[in-house]
Amino acid sequence: MSLLRSASLLLVVVTAALPPCTLGYSLHDGSRLDDVIAEFTAERRPRRLATPAQRRLMGLTEEQHKTVQFYLDKLRELGNRRHPESYNKDSPKNEAYKWRKQMRDDLKTELLNPEKYGRHFEGDIILFPEQAKQIYENALKTGQRRVKRKFIGSDLRRWDPTRPIIYSFDGSHTSREQRIIELALEHRHNITCLNFVRNDNANKGNRIVFTDVDGCASNVGRHPLGEEQLVSLAPECIRLGVIAHEVAHALGFWHEQSRPDRDQFVNVRWENIDKDSKGQFLKEDPDDVDNAGVPYDYGSIMHYRSKAFSRYDDLYTISTFVTDYQKTIGQRDQLSFNDIRLMNKIYCSNVCSRKLPCQRGGYTDPRRCDRCRCPDGFTGQFCEQVMPGYGAVCGGRIQVNSGWTRFSSPGYPREFKEGQECSWLLVAPPGQVVEMQFIGEFEMYCKVRHSLCMDYVEVRNSTDFANTGMRYCCYGTPSTSIRSATTDLVVLFRSFYRGGRGFEARARALPANGQWASWTPWTPCTASCGACGSRMRTRVCPHGACPC
């Protein structure tokens, strides 16, 4: 297939069966050459001249469809029995119900995660009968979904990475929509060892057929009998992030929040989940899971958003234990670094004969074995360099000490421009950590009702910079004081959608074992002889209890 030059920023303007809107997406392919701008106004076309049976079956036989629906109904019943925290209080006569219903209808016009509104398992997963049966039977036994791993376990459903993945279109999409879909496939080609080849004449063997018969939907993994499988992409799904999400399903990936370790990172708010959707939140079985050592990722493109499947769209169904990660989950802009890392571990681990000494959480790039694939914010052969600013002179390595050092978005307090990016690496002296605080006015574009950042300042303060960090956006200065787990802290400024006021922050170095406050004044003496009284001071430690 023809390869597009690596792109850091890709803007797509889509008007198709939705109110006009601008949708921007960023593609980090490891290098910057050009901005690729695909602009189109797709004609308002019919969904797809498909029969009701085609919409209902989605590639299954009538008997297979009945079997899947049987087990999905059982899962709904099981979810309601296990989690009866809520019940349907809606009444058409209730004014609050009418207001909330209108709010829900208004929110649907934005469709940040259109795949959530599907009628399939978890909204967009088309199950085969044996998958539906396995999920239900193991949920019945263990209370969890017994799925082999975040990546599907069966070799029968794994694609052969040494052979091209054949795909075609069935005529549902305009030529411009087809080009957007192919851009998403080309991006995946650039960042993995997988190759996609279009062949509209293929009529046998495994292949992906892009259609528009049932919203955003896909099977999970390769068809085990070597037949075609459908990936449905309706007009509202023609966005790079949503396409990447559905193609990831086709390659064998489940949703992130279904991992067995999810309860260490998020809290499922069962009382806020729609009564027919509780079965969508069951977990994988921890006894039979392998996530290839890749940790839970708040920024995964496979993660539900905060209010997915809620009884009303203003209720949270997923809360992050660390509050500052709340606006990170649910993004549909691009594959996260860990999404790509897991895909390469599953499919491409044997491509390069030598593993490079990559830094900052990077790994040997299976597409270019002489270089490392680096987390956002880093570049260079071994990820040893901070990514330079894009569209502005900004970012870089900052050595901090006990005094405050300030840094800000481009032009602050004037507005930054759409498309500008900055990356900072803040470094404290050995044995110390970095403390960071936001100061001054703060403004970054967000979807307030969805609790989701569109443009953001991301802070990575963990021991692994491959992990997506805490994203800050919207209006009002964040009050959080952030401390790093090591001597280093990464700050990423990303403006994909629009300009704004931006941010200003300050940083300093603190002792790793905590910082003592000043002594308080002596208290008054309690005896006339003097030489008595007391004074005190406190110590604030960045991570847990202070050492004695």
UniProtKB/Swiss-Prot annotation:
- Limits of the TSP type-1 domain: 513-547
Cofactors (names): Zn(2+)
State which residues form the propeptide: 25-150
Residues bound to Zn(2+)? H245, H249, H255
**Family annotation (InterPro entries):** Astacin-like_dom, CUB_dom, EGF-like_dom, MetalloPept_cat_dom_sf, Metallopeptidase_nem, Peptidase_M12A, Peptidase_Metallo, Sperma_CUB_dom_sf
**Any keyword Protease?**
yes
- Residue ranges constituting the CUB domain according to the UniProt record: 394-510
Please state every residue range assigned to the domain named Peptidase M12A: 150-349
Q: Name one GO cellular component term.
A: extracellular region
* UniProt superkingdom: Eukaryota
Active-site residue numbers? E246
Coiled coil ranges (UniProt) are none
The signal sequence is 1-24
Q: Which UniProt keywords apply?
A: Cleavage on pair of basic residues, Disulfide bond, EGF-like domain, Glycoprotein, Hydrolase, Metal-binding, Metalloprotease, Protease, Secreted, Signal, Zinc
* Positions of glycan attachment: N190, N461
Which residue numbers delimit the EGF-like domain?
344-384
Q: List the disulfide bonds.
A: C193-C348, C216-C237, C352-C372, C374-C383, C394-C422, C525-C546, C529-C546, C541-C546
Query: How is the cofactor bound, in the record's words?
Result: Binds 1 zinc ion per subunit.
SUPFAM superfamilies given in the database record: Metalloproteases ('zincins'), catalytic domain, Spermadhesin, CUB domain, TSP-1 type 1 repeat
Q: What is its EC number?
A: 3.4.24.-
Q: Where in the cell is it found?
A: Secreted
Q: Which GO terms describe its molecular function?
A: metalloendopeptidase activity; zinc ion binding
Q: Which GO terms describe its biological process?
A: molting cycle, collagen and cuticulin-based cuticle; proteolysis
Q: What does this protein do?
A: Metalloprotease which cleaves the carboxyl terminus of procollagens to mature collagens. Probably involved in cuticular collagen maturation.
Q: What's the protein called, per UniProt?
A: Zinc metalloproteinase dpy-31
Organism whose genome encodes this protein: Haemonchus contortus (Barber pole worm)
